[in-house]
Amino acid sequence: MLKTIALDAMGGDNGPKVIVPAALSILKKHPKVKLILVGKEDQLALLIPEKNRKSFGQRLEIIHASEEVGMDEPPSQALRTKKNSSMRVAINLVKEGQAHACVSAGNTGALMATARYVLKTLPGIDRPAIIAAFPTKNEREVRVLDLGANVDSTPENLYQFAVMGSILSSAAHNIRNPRIGLLNVGEEEIKGNELVKKANELFETRKTINYIGYVEGNTIFNNIADVVVCDGFVGNAVLKASEGVAQLIKQHAKEAFSEAWWTKLALLPAIPILKRLIRRVDPERYNGATFLGLNGIVVKSHGSANIKAFVCAVEEAIFQVDKNIPQLIKEEVAHILKEFENK
């Protein structure tokens, strides 16, 4: 059976000129995947070579959508007035069962508002959260949530995020009890604001997750926890700061190799090491944040993603379709709720 992914082909800073080549790359790499490009049909068709149309056949489809959601468009306006946007139509395909997942590089707020309106949240989940993977000092990634879906959260919200993050991490790394940390300004019990302290009490009271306690910002990447939980305000700051540091490392490495020839000569033995370092921290490799907790799979690509980065976002969607993440969350939450009822 083919895994079908709907792509918002008009979304993001680069739109079809990145998304169409990325789609062709995915189809070459994943023979059991079908992609639906949603957008302005005439523009999309021009970017697909005839040889690709023939070779991919029914695995590549275009569905016309006459409207686009602007990157700066207010989410409420997009939800209310852009019912035939490429974003809305792609999400509708998931709702209708014509696609297993949707990937968009479009306006984050509009995507969240539309996805939540169309797909709804899973039973027992009050709010969806944005989750993404980050590199650590070894090969195992850490997943952090919420990265910006909810600026204001309750302790119960954070607990639900922890449960969902645990399920996704378990599926990604094939581990039974992922380590869950709560992001705080220190590891001591007395530190933190009221939200974090109450969430800590809740996490310790409920024995449904492998809670290891507080995690500080400087240890997120030390492989102390498999999942780090925080509210969306803090999480988005972590995301942007991490991306900035990664870009700084790449920039310094490039500058080092653009200096005088004798500097380049001295650096020659270090080239393989620097390449590995850059690859490990490259944000493109980790592109693809998931709107976790929805009754369907929606993956958000960075708006400025290039072809390589957008391919990574689509592959995150393929992985979640393979593992049927929404169903796993639904089953685990139902099990937890039943346990609470019996107490």
UniProtKB/Swiss-Prot annotation:
Chief place of localization: cytoplasm
Annotated compartments: Cytoplasm
UniProt keyword terms in alphabetical order: Cytoplasm, Lipid biosynthesis, Lipid metabolism, Phospholipid biosynthesis, Phospholipid metabolism, Transferase
Biological or metabolic pathway of the protein: Lipid metabolism; phospholipid metabolism
GO molecular function: phosphate:acyl-[acyl carrier protein] acyltransferase activity
Gene Ontology biological process: fatty acid biosynthetic process; phospholipid biosynthetic process
Disulfide-linked positions: none
UniProt cross-references to Pfam families, sorted A to Z: FA_synthesis (PF02504)
EC number(s) from the headed UniProt entry: 2.3.1.274
Gene Ontology terms: cellular component: cytoplasm
Catalysed transformations (reactions): a fatty acyl-[ACP] + phosphate = an acyl phosphate + holo-[ACP]
Organism domain of life: Bacteria
Enzyme class: transferase
Summary of subunit composition and partner proteins: Homodimer. Probably interacts with PlsY.
Annotated NCBIfam families: plsX (TIGR00182)
Family assignment from sequence similarity: Belongs to the PlsX family.
Biological role stated in the UniProt entry: Catalyzes the reversible formation of acyl-phosphate (acyl-PO(4)) from acyl-[acyl-carrier-protein] (acyl-ACP). This enzyme utilizes acyl-ACP as fatty acyl donor, but not acyl-CoA.
Protein name (database record): Phosphate acyltransferase
Source lineage: Bacteria, Pseudomonadati, Pseudomonadota, Gammaproteobacteria, Legionellales
